[in-house]
């Protein structure tokens, strides 16, 4: 399978390139970056001291030439541009970008009628196992427990709460028969009054180089249960993304998530 990487000079882009180069059965066929990037024209493996023969380019058609799948962990506005090109060229996509609005999510769903897409809030196997644990816990602790989602990320992250935190909230809300759009509480300040027992609260921390910490607290009277996942490296995300690309090999169309890739549905 031939794989192209978007955001090739970024932290996640470099991790993805390294993962592709170190995975049997896949080949790096293209590397994309934004116009004006100082990395344009460089070999995609330069940061590793390896010559891949793939030059980083801002030309979407050139970067996607020969690709079976594009892996994109960039920003919503960039991903949507890449999505349009991939759809036109028949290139499948693995999308790890977070922060999409409803229109962006609808565009992904529409494109999935033409190409195979894996779109997930988090590509870590551990995080996706945590989603299943939260589903079970929410059903067991459906009454008498207040639910709070606390997440922490590095200072450079531009969206909040994280896509993973929101997915955790959605999993819990679905398990309880609630709608996160109406029960989610994303800010508290001043005299807020007593806590709504049906609400799901979110707290966001940004600082330093934290890769990603997520804790869901089920707080009852006299006891508290916490389910946590802490990432020490982006390696698990890169591994899951390449695994997702391979999953799409026999999927000409359709919108999938990491639960599909792992067979957890």
Curated annotation (Swiss-Prot):
Pathway: Amino-acid biosynthesis; L-lysine biosynthesis via DAP pathway; (S)-tetrahydrodipicolinate from L-aspartate: step 4/4
Classification via InterPro entries: DapB_C, DapB_N, DapB_N_CS, DHDPR_bac, NAD(P)-bd_dom_sf
NAD among keywords: yes
EC identifiers of the protein: 1.17.1.8
Binding residues for NAD(+): 7-12, 33, 96-98, 120-123
Class in the EC hierarchy, top level: oxidoreductase
Tagged with keyword Amino-acid biosynthesis: yes
Catalyzed reactions per annotation: (S)-2,3,4,5-tetrahydrodipicolinate + NAD(+) + H2O = (2S,4S)-4-hydroxy-2,3,4,5-tetrahydrodipicolinate + NADH + H(+); (S)-2,3,4,5-tetrahydrodipicolinate + NADP(+) + H2O = (2S,4S)-4-hydroxy-2,3,4,5-tetrahydrodipicolinate + NADPH + H(+)
Record keywords, A-Z: Amino-acid biosynthesis, Cytoplasm, Diaminopimelate biosynthesis, Lysine biosynthesis, NAD, NADP, Oxidoreductase
Similarity comment: family membership: Belongs to the DapB family.
Protein name: 4-hydroxy-tetrahydrodipicolinate reductase
Organism from which the protein derives: Cupriavidus taiwanensis (strain DSM 17343 / BCRC 17206 / CCUG 44338 / CIP 107171 / LMG 19424 / R1)
């Amino acid at each position: 399978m031939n794989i192209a990487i978007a955001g090739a000079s970024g932290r996640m882009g470099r991790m993805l390139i390294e993962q592709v180069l170190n995975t049997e059965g896949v080949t790096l066929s293209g590397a994309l970056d934004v116009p004006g990037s100082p990395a344009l024209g460089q070999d995609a493996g330069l940061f590793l001291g390896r010559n891949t023969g793939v030059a980083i380019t801002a030309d979407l058609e050139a970067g996607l030439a020969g690709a079976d799948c594009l892996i994109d962990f960039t920003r919503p506005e960039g991903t949507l541009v890449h999505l349009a090109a991939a759809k036109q060229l028949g290139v499948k996509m693995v999308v790890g970008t977070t922060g999409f609005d409803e229109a962006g999510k609808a565009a992904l769903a529409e494109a999935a009628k033409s190409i195979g897409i894996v779109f997930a809030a988090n590509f870590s196997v551990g995080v996706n196992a945590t989603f299943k644990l939260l589903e079970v816990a929410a059903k067991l602790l459906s009454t008498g427990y207040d639910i709070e989602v606390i997440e922490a990320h590095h200072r450079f992250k531009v969206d909040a709460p994280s896509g993973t935190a929101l997915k955790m909230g959605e999993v819990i809300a679905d398990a309880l028969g609630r709608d996160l759009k109406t029960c989610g509480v994303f800010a508290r300040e001043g005299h807020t009054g007593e806590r709504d027992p049906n609400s799901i609260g979110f707290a966001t921390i940004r600082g330093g180089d934290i890769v990603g910490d997520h804790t869901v607290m089920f707080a009852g009277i006299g006891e508290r249960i916490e389910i946590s996942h802490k990432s020490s490296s982006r390696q698990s995300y890169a591994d899951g993304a390449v695994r997702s690309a391979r999953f799409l090999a026999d999927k000409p169309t359709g919108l999938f998530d990491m639960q599909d890739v792992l067979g957890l549905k």
